Amino acid sequence: MFNIHEDAKKYEEYVIGLRQEFHRHPELSDQEVWTSGRICEELDKMGIPYTRVAGTNVVGLIDTGRPGKTIAFRGDIDALPVHEEANVPFKSEIDGLMHACGHDSHAAMVLGAARILNDHKDELSGKIYVCFQKGEEVGIGARDIVEYLKEQGGVDKAFGLHIAANLPTGFISLTAGPSMAGDCNWQVVVKGKGGHGSRPDQANSPIDCFVAIYNALEAARLTKITP
């Protein structure tokens, strides 16, 4: 069996170089034309077939040809409308845009993982999808990839990768259940009963109920959920 640590060290400069290249060329959500094209170039070099999904999403497939689990790795690829002030050699070349949330690293990480796993495809079983998500910062892209993977038969496990400044280089953190913030919408309807201002006892204010709900949710966030 191959030594994953040795391979990670072998391709360390490859991943760093890609990350810096992506950092120099940030693109906003759903506009990741150069980024997705660059990702496809790397997948072509590796001989990994891929599909463009709903625009600038890219999903590559490493198929070992042997029965086994199906795994997906996902990294997002969009940047933010933020001016970069850092004076580094790989500073953003597009004024007003930068990879301020690490998506340059995520794209490079998934490509690095793809290269290692593809190198050892003959030693593995099952299928591995490498997914590059557009538009994460505005809440798009993921659903299209999920639906595409369902059409292909689904996956047994999916790993959404994200860097963490509190972890040393070379370390990963895994946790059961949610570990980072998500982008979703939900709605609560509180129904009250109107009345005259002089007889609040005959009314039922939805505002009082909503404030109680809000305070309970805020308390849960502060005391029950690890930041």
Q: How would you label these PLM feature ranges?
A:
Residues 2-99, 108, 115-124:
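Acidic/His- and Gly-rich active-site-bordering loop/insert found
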Residues 80, 88-98, 105, 122-227:
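Histidine/acidic-residue-rich, glycine-tolerant segments that coordinate divalent metal ions
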